[in-house]
Amino acid sequence: MANLNNIAYRESLGGDDDFDVVRADFRYYLSHGKGNVLAFRQLNHFTSDAPTQVNAPVQLRGYKIGQYNGYYMSSIEGEERWRFAERWTSTFFLGIACTYGGSQSCSNSKDLYPAVGAGVQYILKPKEGIVLNLEYALGKDGNYGVYLNMGYAY
């Protein structure tokens, strides 16, 4: 599954600046076993002439959105969704993001943001696919997150 979009900010429409934000989101799901899924997500976020506060943020579980930004951000994440009971699944995931552009580079470890985590899900309504999801994720430099959501992360 792919999603590509562009958000155009224009002074002529009442904005303070002219710039674009382009996002590309690619997802792939592989079913295996009884109710298990291996999921992948590759996300890209590009800005053009954007003010600093609008630059591309790291978007991985384990990091607060907006804490780490760059002109561009790319990430890849893999997740195993394992059904261990009729209404229960667990997730194990890992990923890495990179901010780049300007003085930032994916070859510099300070611009790389790894994440790892796990969670448990309860399937509230199996036919409708409604899932209650509790996950914990670790990032670098003491970053972490606890997430309680309806549905899977992606």
Predicted regions and their residues:
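Low-complexity, intrinsically disordered Gly/Pro/Thr-rich segments
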Residues: 128-138
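Residue-level signature of outer-membrane beta-barrel architecture
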Residues: 28-30, 80-82, 122-124, 138, ...
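Hydrophobic, well-ordered secondary-structure elements that form the walls
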Residues: 78, 95, 120, 134, ...
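C-terminal outer-membrane beta-barrel translocator/porin domains of Gram-negative envelope proteins
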Residues: 1-102
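Outer-membrane beta-barrel "beta-signal"
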Residues: 117-127, 143-154
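Small/polar, glycine/serine/threonine/aspartate-rich low-complexity segments that form flexible
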Residues: 101-112
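Short glycine-rich, acidic/polar surface loops and turns
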Residues: 76-79, 105, 115-121
